[in-house]
Curated annotation (Swiss-Prot):
Residues 111-120 have a biased composition (Basic and acidic residues). The keyword Phosphoprotein does not apply. The keyword NADP does not apply. It comes from Mus musculus. The lineage of its organism: Eukaryota, Metazoa, Chordata, Craniata, Vertebrata. GO terms for molecular function: structural constituent of ribosome. SUPFAM superfamilies: Ribosomal proteins S24e, L23 and L15e. This is Large ribosomal subunit protein uL23m. PANTHER family: LARGE RIBOSOMAL SUBUNIT PROTEIN UL23M (PTHR12059:SF5), RIBOSOMAL PROTEIN L23-RELATED (PTHR12059). InterPro entries: Nucleotide-bd_a/b_plait_sf, Ribosomal_uL23-like, Ribosomal_uL23/eL15/eS24_sf. GO terms for biological process: mitochondrial translation; translation.
């Protein structure tokens, strides 16, 4: 009896020349509580192990890693739908990566607070805006478009 044999798919070029891309996506997360400067928090898939994360950071991003600690965060189970059935968010894994000696990481300030504009320039701009309205239809507000 003959069996169906699956041969590996032919790809052009040697295996050393191919670029390996992982199926994992990791998220850098701002920690909720204060952590040491050499510790970084990630949200990783449930299938990813400590060794996978260490290799991911060291091989792809050239980040020296001293230790990796993981925990499973259970998803929230409080929401209910229109039939009063509980809706559970999926579980996810949280990884705490301790960087090698001398390495520090501070989370970037992505949204710096802007200084609120003083009201004086607004008062100066108001007459200019009134004059710049459409001169063909005086007395009609600009929001009332034709």
């Amino acid at each position: 009896m003959a069996r169906n044999v699956l041969y590996p798919l032919y790809q052009l070029g040697g295996p050393q020349l191919r670029v390996f891309r992982t199926n994992f996506f990791i998220q850098l997360v701002r920690p909720g509580t204060a952590q040491p400067e050499d510790t970084v928090q990630f949200r990783i898939p449930m299938e990813m192990t400590r060794v996978d994360l260490r290799n991911y950071l060291e091989q792809i991003y050239n980040v020296p890693v001293a230790a990796v600690r993981t925990r499973v965060q259970h998803g929230s189970n409080r929401r209910r739908d229109h039939k009063n059935v509980r809706i559970k968010k999926p579980d996810y894994k949280v990884a705490y990566v301790q960087l090698a000696h001398g390495q520090t990481f501070t989370f970037p300030d992505l949204f710096p607070e802007k200084d609120p504009r003083s009201p004086e320039p607004l008062e100066e701009e108001l007459p200019q805006q009134r004059q710049s309205s459409d001169l063909r239809c005086p007395g009609i507000p600009s929001w009332f478009g034709l």
